[in-house]
Amino acid sequence: MMQSQQIPTTFQRYETKYMLSPIMARKLRKSLPGHLQMDEYGLDTICSLYYDTPDHQLIRRSLEKPVYKEKLRLRSYGPAKETSPIYVELKKKYEGIVYKRRERMILSEAVPYLAGKSEPGFDSQILHEITWFRNYYRGLAPAMYIAYDRIACFGTEDRNFRVTFDTNIRWRTDNLCPDGPTEGTRLLEPGWYLMEVKTPGAVPLWFSKILDDLAIYPASFSKYGFAYQIENQKESEEKEKAFIPFTDIRQTVSKTAFR
């Protein structure tokens, strides 16, 4: 078998999330010049297709906030096409540290691979891990599509210190095709940002001071988790509307039976 391309395939770092209102985002933006530099991709659209079991075992477990949790997704930078590169990514979190293991494939190779219908034309340790995950969780299938616009930055003094700003986050549970449109239901109000701070170690003191001065605090937030809760609540409400209590049925029968 040919070997996988030599690209970054593993990440191990701390990731902290912050929810920024439009006002907070404007104030923070004024404090960052000279400290952060936008990376070579600038503003990009990130598209992720999350896989889960039929009973949503992975996201339900994740929402319970266990010590260890994991997710599987297909990720593309920009709208995916049949022959465009895409990442098959296994994301794990253990005691606050995020581990990402991913392999690059083309879309037409990745989708049948995750469906268990074929194997890619290369071999690697990471691929073995993803394959084990795919086989362990029976019935894995696309569960939710999430896209958002991201501004990615890195520290001018330390390129390993990264900060991303995600906005226009949208999601859907229909048309779960990686190469489909990037439209969906908005997850946040217009102007809001999800900021993620990613670092292999401690956050720089200058950044901590800026957050303290602006009263910006960490937030527990998962795009897939939050969207799943919204979808789950919507389904519950629809079921309640469709359910007619027995007392209502009895009253209806008593009023119409002898007409």
Model-derived segments and spans:
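Phosphate-end processing signature that detects enzymes handling 5′-triphosphorylated RNA
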Residues: 1-259
